[in-house]
C-alpha cells in the first residue's frame, strides 16, 4: 500500500472511533499492519514477531523499555557492568576456551502469549542453602526486582551448575555474542578489557585479553545484560583459580519466565480494573495505562494496609490472599479476597478512611497512588467525579464507599 492509502485508512478509523488516546490507537494500527505484512512472508526459521493483537505489541515494547534501559544500572552496582553471555561461534577456540553455551538464540520467540501457551519447563528445586546464596547474590539486581516470589524462585531454579576445574579458562570473550548470565559460587574470575571498539573474539584470543579491570569473587555475578540482549561482550572473564563453581542462566529461560509472568499479570490487572465501577467511564487504552502503572506490594498476616481516619491516597486490588475490614466499635465487618478492591474513591476525592483494612493472611496487592492516577488520566477524572457512584455518600454496608467487593465473576 502507498503512504496515501495507509494514511486515508488510518484517518477514516480515527474519525469513526474517535479514540481518546490517539498515539496508542495509531501504534496499534501500524502494529496490526506490520503483523499482516509479515505473515505473508513469514518462514518457519525466522523470528516470531507476530502478536495476537496490538495490546501485546504495546506491552512487549513497554516491558523491554522497563527492564532494558541503560539507566537501570546504578552507579553503586557491585558487579561488572555490560558483560553478557556467550554464543556458539564458527571459530577455532583454544582448548581452554570453555563453551558453556547453547546454540544461537536468533530464532527465539519474544511473543509473551506464545510463552503462555508453551509447555512449561520444570526445573528440579535447588537445595535451600544454595537457593539462599543465589538470592543473596542477585539481591537488588534490576532484572529480578519486578518478579514475584514464585517466578523469582523459578528463575533461580532454572540456573545450572557449571564446574571449571582449571585456572585460565575463558568463560566469556570480549566481542563474542552471548546469552548467559553467571553467578560465582566458588573461585575467582579476572575481568580483562581491550580498548579497541568492535574487536572480534578471534582477535582477542589470538593477541591477548587486554588490560586487567577487576576480580569477581563468590557471591558476585557477571553477564546480566546477556539476559536482555545478544550484543557483543564488553570484556573477557577468565578463571583465576582452580576448582571453580558457577551457576549459569540462559536468556531464553529467563525471558520466558519474566515475559510470561508480566503478561499474565497485566491481563489479570486489566480484567480486574474492568470490574471497578468508578473506572467504568474509562476506555480500553486508559485502563491499559493504569494496568501498566500498578505496582505489587506484599503484606504479611496481621499488617495494616490502611487505617481508619487516615487521608486516602492509594487504590488497591487484591491479587492473592485475604484482608479484613475493621470498623472501630464493630470489629470485622467483612473479609475481602482475590479480585476485591478498596480505596478507589481516594483517587478522585480527599476522603478519610472510614475503616481499617488489615491482612488476614499473606496479602498480595496491586496498587497505585493519586499522583500517578492524575498524571495518566488528567481530564478524565472530572468525568469520573460526576458518576453516580462517585457522588454517593460513604455509608455503604462497610461504612466506607471505598471498600468494595467485586462481582462474583472476578473470583478465582
From Swiss-Prot:
<dbReference type="InterPro" id="IPR003117">
    <property type="entry name" value="cAMP_dep_PK_reg_su_I/II_a/b"/>
</dbReference>
<dbReference type="GO" id="GO:0034236">
    <property type="term" value="F:protein kinase A catalytic subunit binding"/>
</dbReference>
<feature type="region of interest" description="Disordered">
    <location>
        <begin position="392"/>
        <end position="412"/>
    </location>
</feature>
<keyword id="KW-0116">cAMP-binding</keyword>
<feature type="binding site">
    <location>
        <position position="353"/>
    </location>
    <ligand>
        <name>3',5'-cyclic AMP 2</name>
    </ligand>
</feature>
<feature type="region of interest" description="Dimerization and phosphorylation">
    <location>
        <begin position="1"/>
        <end position="142"/>
    </location>
</feature>
<feature type="modified residue" description="Phosphoserine">
    <location>
        <position position="104"/>
    </location>
</feature>
<dbReference type="InterPro" id="IPR018490">
    <property type="entry name" value="cNMP-bd_dom_sf"/>
</dbReference>
<feature type="binding site">
    <location>
        <begin position="278"/>
        <end position="412"/>
    </location>
    <ligand>
        <name>3',5'-cyclic AMP 2</name>
    </ligand>
</feature>
<dbReference type="GO" id="GO:0030552">
    <property type="term" value="F:cAMP binding"/>
</dbReference>
<dbReference type="GO" id="GO:0007189">
    <property type="term" value="P:adenylate cyclase-activating G protein-coupled receptor signaling pathway"/>
</dbReference>
<comment type="subunit">
    <text>Tetramer, composed of 2 regulatory (R) and 2 catalytic (C) subunits. In the presence of cAMP it dissociates into 2 active monomeric C subunits and an R dimer.</text>
</comment>
<dbReference type="GO" id="GO:0005952">
    <property type="term" value="C:cAMP-dependent protein kinase complex"/>
</dbReference>
<feature type="binding site">
    <location>
        <position position="224"/>
    </location>
    <ligand>
        <name>3',5'-cyclic AMP 1</name>
    </ligand>
</feature>
<keyword id="KW-0114">cAMP</keyword>
<dbReference type="GO" id="GO:0005634">
    <property type="term" value="C:nucleus"/>
</dbReference>
<dbReference type="Pfam" id="PF00027">
    <property type="entry name" value="cNMP_binding"/>
</dbReference>
<dbReference type="GO" id="GO:0046827">
    <property type="term" value="P:positive regulation of protein export from nucleus"/>
</dbReference>
<keyword id="KW-0677">Repeat</keyword>
<dbReference type="InterPro" id="IPR050503">
    <property type="entry name" value="cAMP-dep_PK_reg_su-like"/>
</dbReference>
<feature type="binding site">
    <location>
        <position position="344"/>
    </location>
    <ligand>
        <name>3',5'-cyclic AMP 2</name>
    </ligand>
</feature>
<dbReference type="GO" id="GO:0110034">
    <property type="term" value="P:negative regulation of adenylate cyclase-activating glucose-activated G protein-coupled receptor signaling pathway"/>
</dbReference>
<dbReference type="GO" id="GO:0042149">
    <property type="term" value="P:cellular response to glucose starvation"/>
</dbReference>
<feature type="binding site">
    <location>
        <position position="233"/>
    </location>
    <ligand>
        <name>3',5'-cyclic AMP 1</name>
    </ligand>
</feature>
<dbReference type="InterPro" id="IPR012198">
    <property type="entry name" value="cAMP_dep_PK_reg_su"/>
</dbReference>
<dbReference type="Pfam" id="PF02197">
    <property type="entry name" value="RIIa"/>
</dbReference>
<dbReference type="GO" id="GO:0004862">
    <property type="term" value="F:cAMP-dependent protein kinase inhibitor activity"/>
</dbReference>
<dbReference type="GO" id="GO:0005737">
    <property type="term" value="C:cytoplasm"/>
</dbReference>
<protein>
    <recommendedName>
        <fullName>cAMP-dependent protein kinase regulatory subunit</fullName>
    </recommendedName>
</protein>
<feature type="binding site">
    <location>
        <begin position="143"/>
        <end position="277"/>
    </location>
    <ligand>
        <name>3',5'-cyclic AMP 1</name>
    </ligand>
</feature>
<dbReference type="InterPro" id="IPR000595">
    <property type="entry name" value="cNMP-bd_dom"/>
</dbReference>
<feature type="short sequence motif" description="Pseudophosphorylation motif">
    <location>
        <begin position="101"/>
        <end position="105"/>
    </location>
</feature>
<dbReference type="InterPro" id="IPR018488">
    <property type="entry name" value="cNMP-bd_CS"/>
</dbReference>
<dbReference type="GO" id="GO:0005829">
    <property type="term" value="C:cytosol"/>
</dbReference>
<keyword id="KW-0597">Phosphoprotein</keyword>
<keyword id="KW-0547">Nucleotide-binding</keyword>
<dbReference type="InterPro" id="IPR014710">
    <property type="entry name" value="RmlC-like_jellyroll"/>
</dbReference>
<comment type="similarity">
    <text>Belongs to the cAMP-dependent kinase regulatory chain family.</text>
</comment>
Amino acid at each position: 500500500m502507498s503512504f496515501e492509502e495507509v494514511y486515508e485508512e488510518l484517518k477514516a478509523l480515527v474519525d469513526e472511533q474517535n479514540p481518546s488516546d490517539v498515539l496508542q490507537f495509531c501504534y496499534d494500527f501500524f502494529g496490526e499492519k506490520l503483523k499482516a505484512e509479515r505473515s505473508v512472508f513469514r518462514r518457519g526459521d525466522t523470528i516470531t514477531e507476530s502478536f495476537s493483537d496490538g495490546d501485546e505489541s504495546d506491552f512487549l515494547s513497554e516491558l523491554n523499555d522497563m527492564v532494558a534501559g541503560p539507566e537501570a544500572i546504578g552507579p553503586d552496582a557491585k558487579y561488572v557492568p555490560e558483560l553478557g553471555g556467550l554464543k556458539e561461534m564458527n571459530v577455532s577456540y583454544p582448548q581452554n576456551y570453555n563453551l558453556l553455551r547453547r546454540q544461537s538464540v536468533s530464532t527465539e520467540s519474544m511473543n509473551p502469549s506464545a510463552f503462555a501457551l508453551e509447555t512449561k519447563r520444570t526445573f528440579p528445586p535447588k537445595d535451600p542453602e544454595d537457593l539462599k546464596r543465589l538470592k543473596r547474590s542477585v539481591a537488588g539486581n534490576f532484572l529480578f526486582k519486578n518478579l514475584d516470589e514464585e517466578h523469582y524462585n523459578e528463575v533461580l531454579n532454572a540456573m545450572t551448575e557449571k564446574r571449571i576445574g582449571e585456572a585460565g579458562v575463558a568463560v566469556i570473550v570480549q566481542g563474542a555474542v552471548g546469552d548467559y548470565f553467571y553467578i560465582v559460587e566458588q573461585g575467582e574470575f579476572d575481568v580483562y578489557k581491550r580498548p579497541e571498539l568492535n574487536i572480534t573474539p578471534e582477535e582477542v584470543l589470538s593477541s591477548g585479553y587486554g588490560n586487567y579491570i577487576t576480580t569477581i569473587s563468590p557471591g558476585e555475578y557477571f553477564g546480566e545484560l546477556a539476559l536482555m540482549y545478544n550484543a557483543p561482550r564488553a570484556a573477557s572473564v577468565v578463571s583465576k583459580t582452580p576448582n571453580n563453581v558457577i551457576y549459569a542462566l540462559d536468556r531464553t529461560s529467563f525471558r520466558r519466565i519474566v515475559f510470561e509472568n508480566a503478561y499474565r499479570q497485566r491481563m489479570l490487572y486489566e480484567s480486574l480494573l474492568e470490574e471497578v465501577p468508578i473506572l467504568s467511564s474509562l476506555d480500553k487504552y486508559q485502563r491499559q495505562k493504569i494496568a501498566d502503572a500498578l505496582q505489587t506490594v506484599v503484606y504479611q498476616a496481621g499488617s495494616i494496609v490502611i487505617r481508619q481516619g487516615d487521608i486516602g491516597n492509594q487504590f488497591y486490588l487484591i491479587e492473592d490472599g485475604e484482608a479484613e475490614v475493621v470498623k472501630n466499635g464493630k470489629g470485622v465487618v467483612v473479609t475481602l479476597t482475590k479480585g476485591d478492591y478498596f480505596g478507589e474513591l481516594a483517587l478522585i476525592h480527599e476522603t478519610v478512611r472510614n475503616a481499617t483494612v488489615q491482612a488476614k493472611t499473606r496479602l498480595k496487592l496491586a496498587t497505585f497512588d493519586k499522583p500517578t492516577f492524575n498524571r495518566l488520566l488528567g481530564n478524565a477524572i472530572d468525568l469520573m467525579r460526576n458518576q453516580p457512584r462517585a457522588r454517593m455518600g460513604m455509608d455503604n454496608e462497610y461504612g466506607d464507599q471505598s471498600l468494595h467487593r467485586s462481582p462474583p465473576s472476578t473470583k478465582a
